[in-house]
């Protein structure tokens, strides 16, 4: 993978596969979104590299990328994604996102339509009548509890066992960096317990702001977006079907996929056709 250094010191790793019209992939697994997470997902759009230039990336809190000790910001991760396209000289691309980073794909559609040819949302997260913010805040409960009850040394020790936050929430959202860069532990220690806990809360609230149904953009922005959207509904509290349905209703140029987890091969066919029609 290639590495891009961002103004705030973050490093973003990305890889280019295939040739053809550009498609940016934003992987599943929440904060732990790295290109490798496509390996075990029910559908792997990297196979589109047989017809398209596919760009994969590790988001700043995952994989080989690195993030500073700062709250999560949808603006920051969106800027990372734009920066990857810029360094590759890509003026516009289609965007395929799964899970949490559908929020970034929506920012492409709503805030950068000139850079966005089409957008595919696979099982987007968000709020509807079937869930509450507690569903998303729960991911951080163990992080806060571990630091408060056991202290920062226990957080650092937890990170040594597993660098993937969604599988090791006690270690906090910087666990991939603590795992791979032992010297980073001193930066965590220097915060002190209470400041670290406050930072976790700010990180959580930045990732899942209570006042935005889709987390990164508001409903009016979605209503005003004209970029073609293909949406695959989820079927659980984290990925409610109602969120996909509301997006389909709000957006002016959106369609729902026929296939989903029940038929990933058919879903890939739908995605391929959608990209070909909107490139």
Model-inferred region functions:
Residues 6-66:
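Conserved HGGG/HGGXW glycine-rich cap/lid loop of the alpha/beta-hydrolase fold
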Residues 95-98, 122:
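Short beta-strand immediately N-terminal to the catalytic nucleophile in serine-hydrolase-like folds
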Residues 97-105:
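Gly/Ala-rich beta-loop-alpha elbow adjacent to hydrolase catalytic centers
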Residues 149-202:
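Conserved alpha/beta-hydrolase catalytic His-Asp/Glu region
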Residues 193-245, 257-266:
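Conserved serine/cysteine hydrolase catalytic core
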Residues 249-279:
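Catalytic active-site module of serine/aspartate enzymes centered on a nucleophile-bearing elbow/loop
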């Amino acid at each position: 993978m290639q590495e891009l250094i961002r103004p705030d010191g973050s490093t973003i790793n990305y890889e280019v596969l295939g040739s053809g019209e550009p498609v940016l992939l934003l992987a599943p697994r929440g904060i732990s979104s790295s290109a490798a997470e496509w390996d075990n997902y029910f559908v792997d759009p990297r196979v589109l590299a047989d017809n398209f230039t596919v760009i994969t990336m590790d988001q700043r809190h995952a994989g080989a990328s690195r993030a500073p000790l700062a709250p999560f910001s949808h603006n920051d991760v969106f800027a990372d994604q734009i920066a990857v396209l810029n360094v590759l000289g890509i003026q516009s691309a289609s965007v395929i996102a799964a899970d949490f980073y559908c929020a970034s794909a929506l920012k492409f559609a709503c805030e950068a339509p000139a850079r966005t040819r089409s957008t595919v949302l696979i099982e987007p997260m968000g709020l509807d009548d079937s869930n509450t913010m507690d569903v998303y805040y729960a991911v951080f409960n163990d992080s806060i509890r571990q630091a408060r009850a056991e202290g920062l040394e226990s957080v650092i020790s937890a990170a040594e066992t597993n660098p993937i936050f969604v599988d090791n929430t006690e270690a906090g959202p910087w666990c991939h960096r603590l795992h791979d860069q032992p010297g980073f532990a001193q930066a965590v220690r220097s915060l002190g317990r209470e400041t670290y806990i406050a930072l976790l809360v700010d990180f959580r609230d930045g990732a899942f702001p209570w006042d935005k149904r889709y987390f990164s953009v508001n409903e009016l922005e979605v209503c005003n977006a004209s970029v073609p959207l293909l949406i695959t509904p989820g079927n659980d509290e984290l990925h409610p079907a109602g969120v996909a349905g509301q997006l389909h209703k709000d957006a002016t140029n959106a369609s729902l996929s026929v296939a989903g987890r029940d038929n990933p091969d058919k879903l890939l066919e739908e995605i391929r056709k959608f990209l070909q029609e909107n490139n």
